[in-house]
Amino acid sequence: YAKEIQTPYYGEGLDGLLSARWQSLWGIVNGIDYEVWNPATDPQVYKNYSVDNFRQLKKINKIELQKECGLPQDENQFVIGIISRLTDQKGLDLVDRIMNDICCDGVQFIVLGTGDGKYENMFKYYQGIHPAKVSANIYYSDERSHKMYAGCDVMLVPSRFEPCGLTQLMALRYGTVPVVRETGGLADTVEAYNQFEG
């Protein structure tokens, strides 16, 4: 992110100054409280788990999350989550372009957040036409967010720009793969997939 804000696209008019003072510019990565965000002790998840047993117990969290979100319960469904402010910055127009493709066999989609009416309505629309595939939770709940980190397979973070972000860090902590747009702090905290090295 510190490099990005030295460009005209991300610099918001300060790119010249930031570029001139690049040696004094440092990026500081966000962190999370490991006592609060700990699937082994989190009182808000359905079933606690650790690195030793997450393969079995994460499935229980998925089934319970599906039930709570009004989706058919099936541990073999691939569950994608978004926990976000629903705004342009968060890249949700990119999700809109592929939403019908995402709602194919074997995939479910759960969103949690509030924001711009166009995105709130977009997710409500997709829930209406794909009720067995999409759960649009147009509000914020700390408890539901913990349950989503514990129950989803993937957390989608398609932000157009992101100084750092926390969603990807929480997802990693819960063994939920963050799929992020390679920008800002997302690029700083999530290693890019390499098809040759895994």
Regions found by a protein language model. Name each.
Residues Y1-G198:
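Catalytic cores of nucleotide-sugar-dependent glycosyltransferases that transfer UDP/GDP/TDP-activated
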